[in-house]
C-alpha cells in the first residue's frame, strides 16, 4: 500500500467516524455514496473495475474497528 493510499484510508475512516459521532445515518451515507459512484454523477472520476473497488472500500471503512 502506498503512503497516499494509507493517508486516504485514514481520512475516509475519520470522515465516516465524524459523521457517525455527529449522529449521521451511516447506512444512508453508504447508500448515497455508492449511488453517486455507480450512477455516473459529478463525483465519479473512475471507471470499472475501480467503481466496484471504491464501493468495497467504503464498506470496509464503515466497518472498521480498531
Predicted segments, located by residue:
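Low-complexity intrinsically disordered segments
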Residues: 29-66
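N-terminal acidic leader/helix
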Residues: 1-24
